[in-house]
Design a protein with these regions (language model features):
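Positively charged, low-complexity intrinsically disordered leader regions
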Residues: 1-39, 46
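C-terminal binding/interaction regions
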Residues: 2-17, 86-155, 262, 268, ...
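A short, flexible beta-alpha/helix-coil linker loop
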Residues: 26-27, 64, 163-164, 241-243
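Acidic-glycine-rich active-site phosphate/pyrophosphate-binding loop
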Residues: 29-40, 152, 229-237
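Short, glycine-rich nucleotide/cofactor-binding loops
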Residues: 32-38, 163-167, 244-249
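Small-aliphatic-rich amphipathic alpha-helix that forms the alpha element of a beta-alpha
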Residues: 43-50, 56, 256-259
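N-terminal active-site beta-alpha-beta segment that forms phosphate/nucleotide-binding
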Residues: 49-218
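Conserved phosphate- and dinucleotide-binding cores of soluble alpha/beta proteins
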Residues: 187, 193-345
Length: 345
């Protein structure tokens, strides 16, 4: 599945719709659904039908085009369009790729604002398609740079899902793993389940098994056990937002893994495109962390797993301190956290 698009613009009718994999159904069903309105896109992002920072960015670009299509008969077209874009941008606050894509689409509108509404719509669609295609190429570059870091016979731990389904295709952290596998590095991947939404168990194992990459599923609390035994000697995860100093927001539990890796002397890498680096954010303290519904923790398969009345706090992300990160793998190469300002300002 590394080579197919998991989210793409589909030409249908006058302008088209967004076509994406419904990730809430995996691993039980691989199904693509059509998103036809900006409200549907907001809901798809919010409810994690589409998830993964790069994929959310493309979804935002598609949502902007859908909003323009909806408003083509309205007066005050551009102001109303910007309001809808801002609404889509509010669906998930932590992943910077969403706001990056909305900003890209607003720039397209500004460049074409003297043209007809139809021309603006077409420009937004074409830019969204361009971003789709660029994402796959970016991920393959990340994969190739990262694969050079992976030792032979490596036991690689990854957290959550930063694969084809978290992007348009190929993946960031899983892109590194895919490229290492192609280079016959004889790897074993350890995917932790990633509570509470189980993206590692549901989605990462689904991707890797489909691609024939040796994979072992472990629970979130097991990483130190396998590190101490020498079975894990390399860690790579994706990212949702990287601050200027290298502090990195990623799925809750990432920081715990990084601390354990540091203790055992295991290199911990982040794999992410330039669009995930937010130079306006100085440190991780300034990153907004999304809090999600407590039922994600309390209920599994429709059944409660805890006592009634217990309190739950459910942050979706944590911030890994830059001092724990060996390097950040981008489409431009691998950088130490302290090198970001010089190379991406």
């Amino acid at each position: 599945m590394a080579e197919e698009k998991t989210i793409e613009w589909l030409k249908e009718g006058e302008f088209g719709v967004s076509l994406m994999v419904d990730q809430t159904l995996i691993p039980y069903e691989y199904k693509k659904i059509k998103i036809k309105t900006s409200d549907e896109m907001f809901n798809a992002i919010k409810t994690m039908i589409v998830r993964g920072a790069p994929a959310i960015g493309i979804a935002g670009a598609h949502g902007a085009a859908l909003a323009a299509i909806e408003l083509k008969g309205e007066d005050d077209f551009i102001n109303k369009l910007y309001k809808k874009m801002d609404y889509i941008n509010s669906s998930r606050p932590t992943a910077v790729n969403l706001s990056w894509a909305i900003k890209e689409q607003k720039e397209i509108v500004e460049k074409n604002k003297e043209k007809t509404k139809k021309e603006i719509i077409e420009a937004l669609i074409q830019n969204a398609i361009k971003l789709e295609n660029e994402d796959i190429e970016i991920n393959k570059k990340i994969g190739d740079f990262g694969a050079e870091l992976v030792p032979k016979n490596a036991g690689i731990l990854t957290h959550c899902n930063a694969g084809a389904l978290a992007t348009v295709g190929y993946g960031t952290a899983l892109g590194v793993i895919r490229s290492a596998f192609k280079k016959d590095k004889n790897i074993m991947v350890y995917a932790d389940e990633t509570r509470p939404r189980q993206q590692g168990a549901r989605i990462t194992t689904y991707e890797l098994v489909r691609d024939g990459i040796p994979t072992t599923l472990i629970t979130d609390g097991m990483c130190s056990y396998f590190m101490k035994k020498g079975m894990i000697n390399f860690v790579v995860t994706g990212a949702d937002r990287i601050a200027a100093n290298g502090d990195t927001a990623n799925k809750i539990g990432t920081s715990t893994i990084a601390i354990a890796a540091k203790y055992y002397g295991i290199p911990f890498y982040i794999a992410a495109p330039k669009s995930t680096i937010d130079m306006k954010i100085k440190t991780g303290d300034d990153i907004v962390i999304e809090l999600r519904d407590e039922d994600e923790v309390k209920i599994i398969n429709g059944k409660p797993i805890c006592a009634d009345g217990v309190k739950v706090i459910n942050p979706s992300f944590d911030v890994t301190d830059h001092s724990l990160i060996k390097g950040i793998i981008t489409e431009y190469g691998v950088f130490k956290p302290e090198e970001l300002k010089e190379n991406f300002s």
